[in-house]
């Protein structure tokens, strides 16, 4: 395996650092950035900020760095973002033409769909109003609430996030109408899917 220089800005703990180093023996790693872990905060090490020298040194970057720091670096062979969106990195002059750019599409669908469902329930059930009333001991109606069951939910974008959200709404008894950019068969969790024109 060829030796590479990898800059890792994804929050990692000692266990994951060791796994990366075992998976790529001979590679030199620099771990930088915000170093907090939701799943294992006891493993988090104090984070060091990413510097321009780190970015210029790297042949591989795992994680997100400010696009302005890349400036078409010829040394950078691969940028793997820890986000689905890569808009900042596809602008002219950010990456050299032969730099491989990959993203984390598919990594956040479940988590974001559950958050969206929580927000939908908060709005439909007026949960924030009832929470505030409970704190003040005022038990009065906050007006009519809605149910997801029997509602029609329109989902714009039926990719990973939209699909996961649609599936959860369907499981709660909603009629789901999806909109997507490319033609595909209607998934079982949607009643209708239309193309964006």
Where do the PLM segments sit?
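N-terminal glycine-/charge-rich "phosphate-binding" loop or analogous flexible N-terminal tail
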Residues: 1-58
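Phosphate-coordination loops involved in phosphoryl transfer and adenosine-cofactor binding
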Residues: 3, 98, 149-152
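Short, polar loop motifs at secondary-structure junctions
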Residues: 11-14, 63-68, 85-86, 178-185
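Generic structural signal for small/hydrophobic residues in well-ordered secondary structure
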Residues: 20, 61, 79, 116, ...
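Conserved beta-strand segments of alpha/beta enzyme cores
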Residues: 28-30, 77, 100, 175, ...
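Short acidic low-complexity segments
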Residues: 47-54, 67-70, 186-197
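Phosphate/diphosphate ligand-binding glycine-rich loop within oxidoreductases
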Residues: 56-134, 142-146
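Rossmann-like dinucleotide/phosphate-binding beta-alpha-beta segment
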Residues: 144-197
């Amino acid at each position: 395996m060829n030796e590479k220089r990898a800059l890792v800005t994804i929050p990692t703990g000692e266990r994951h650092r060791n796994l990366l180093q075992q998976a790529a023996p001979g590679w030199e790693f620099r771990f930088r950035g915000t170093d907090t872990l939701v799943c294992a905060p006891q493993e988090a090490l104090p984070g060091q900020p990413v510097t321009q020298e780190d970015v210029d040194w790297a042949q591989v970057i795992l994680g997100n760095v400010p696009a302005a720091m890349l400036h078409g670096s010829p040394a950078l062979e691969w940028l793997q973002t820890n986000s689905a969106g890569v808009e900042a990195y596809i602008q002219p002059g950010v990456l050299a033409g032969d730099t491989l750019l990959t993203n984390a599409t598919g990594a956040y669908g479940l988590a974001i769909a559950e958050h969206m469902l929580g927000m939908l329930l908060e709005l439909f059930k007026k949960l924030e109003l009832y929470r505030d009333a409970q704190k003040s001991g005022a038990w009065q109606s906050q007006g009519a609430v809605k149910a997801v069951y029997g509602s029609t939910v329109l989902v714009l974008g039926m990719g990973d996030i939209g699909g996961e959200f649609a599936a959860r709404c369907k499981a709660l008894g909603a009629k789901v109408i999806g909109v997507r950019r490319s033609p595909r068969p209607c998934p079982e969790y949607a009643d209708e899917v239309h193309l964006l024109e």
